[in-house]
Amino acid sequence: MCSVTGVLILNPHNYKEIEKKLAKILIRAEDRGRDSFGIVVIQKDGSTKSSKHVGKPSLQEEKLYGILDENSKVVIANNRAEPTTEYVRRKTENDIQPFEGERFVVTHNGIIANDMELEKKYKVSKLSRIDSSVLPPVLDRSWNGNLDSLSEILNSIRGSFALVIGDKKNPDRIFIAQNFKPVYMMYDRDLGAVFFTSLDDYFDATELDNVTKLDPYSVVMVDDKLEIRKVPLLKEKNKKRILVVASGGLDSTVAATYLVRQGHEVTLLHFNYHHKAEEKEREAVRKISEYLNVPFVEIDTDLFKIVGHSTLIKGSSGEIVKDRKGEEGAEFAHEWVPARNLIFFSVALAMAEAYGFDAIASGINLEEAGAYPDNEMEFVRMFSRLVPYAVGPNKKVEVLMPVGNLVKHEIVKLGVQIDAPLHLTWSCYEGGNKHCGKCGPCYMRKVAFEVNGLKDPVEYEA
């Protein structure tokens, strides 16, 4: 495994300071690569200079300097942790990344499982025993330097990769390609350079520095005019198969209905987790699935009964908070269930990957984000960023929040507009014959209908 590093130099007069920053990055990157390090510099005229060495850069710091000059344009570098399956007892310069072809210079983090197949397909030979060394000959043979055509070649790779690529014919630009292996970008305005590396920690950036995580499964080109172009490696679908985590309440029901009305293929996923309203929610979701004419999957779990520490679970010692006619329960997470949405999302993600769904969705919304951290839009955004590292290679599962930016009365309004089966929903934390009318969800529901001047179609206890 490796850390990949690249630099696009915009102001060559600052080459000495740029070199110092590069050296610091490579030393910090030792935790992803201790066995060797290499630097290849592409000059303004397309010629190259290189420095490759066995061992840690921190123990040979002098070899990190004296490489750049006023004509340097692009730097491609690598720190390598030699995989057990590719251990080379006596390494030569040919076994050290970056690898240099006739036109392209490549540094690679990951494993290419089909390197021998690529040799046959493109009729090339590896530059070394290392799998990564197949890439420069493949690119030399089949790539014209156009961003769009690069994605087609990369999709023939079976394995993992983060690539930083330099083009000797066009030393005014740098390319970054990745599936699930990470690459970060930092623009140093003062130095006049754009830096790339595998972890943002290696930049030693401050809060005011411009650091960006590049999207997984993308190919990016940055040129010396600071133009950035990006193309995805995975195709986007207009009509999606979506697995909706459905409780039977207002929010997830409106979310599911909205997706159905958008033309997507929706399946409802419901969890029976020994909560007090389990039977009523289960009944509601079944009726909602019939109304929307969509499949319904349910999962029974004892996990939250084992975790405990929530008044929402059957047999708990506490009671549902009903102070101030339910307003107290609406404004604070008294009925918090530890890590519930994280677990629900994780199970939904596993099922989505296994059964070929394109996305998962839920009824997470702005109203309940005021009390519950795992209803915050940021929770969904952060989980979405985690997904490429939680599913298999070349799998894409989106995380959607159709009502994420709406408050409760807006959700009710939208539900009426799209003919969502609000009359079939169950919002109450209790599992009685009717809504209790006094818990937090009941309070929010009643107020939401009142704001819209509508009669709530469900019944409440007197």
Swiss-Prot record:
Enzyme Commission code: 6.3.4.20
Active site: C2 (for gatase activity)
Pathway membership: Purine metabolism; 7-cyano-7-deazaguanine biosynthesis
Cofactor binding note from Swiss-Prot or TrEMBL: Binds 1 zinc ion per subunit.
The keyword Disulfide bond appears for this protein: no
GO MF term list: ATP binding; ligase activity, forming carbon-nitrogen bonds; zinc ion binding
Record's keyword terms, sorted: ATP-binding, Glutamine amidotransferase, Ligase, Metal-binding, Nucleotide-binding, Zinc
Superkingdom, taxonomy of origin: Archaea
Binding site for Zn(2+): C428, C436, C439, C442
Uppermost EC category: ligase
Cofactor: Zn(2+)
Gene3D superfamilies, per the entry: Glutamine Phosphoribosylpyrophosphate, subunit 1, domain 1, HUPs
Annotated binding of ATP, by residue: A246, S247, G248, G249, L250, D251, S252, T253, V254, A255, A256
CDD domains in the record: Gn_AT_II (cd00352), QueC-like (cd01995)
A Pfam match: QueC
Catalytic activity: 7-carboxy-7-deazaguanine + NH4(+) + ATP = 7-cyano-7-deazaguanine + ADP + phosphate + H2O + H(+)
NCBIfam families: 7-cyano-7-deazaguanine synthase QueC
Family, similarity comment: Belongs to the QueC family.
Function: Catalyzes the ATP-dependent conversion of 7-carboxy-7-deazaguanine (CDG) to 7-cyano-7-deazaguanine (preQ(0)).
Protein name: 7-cyano-7-deazaguanine synthase
Organism encoding this protein: Sulfolobus acidocaldarius (strain ATCC 33909 / DSM 639 / JCM 8929 / NBRC 15157 / NCIMB 11770)
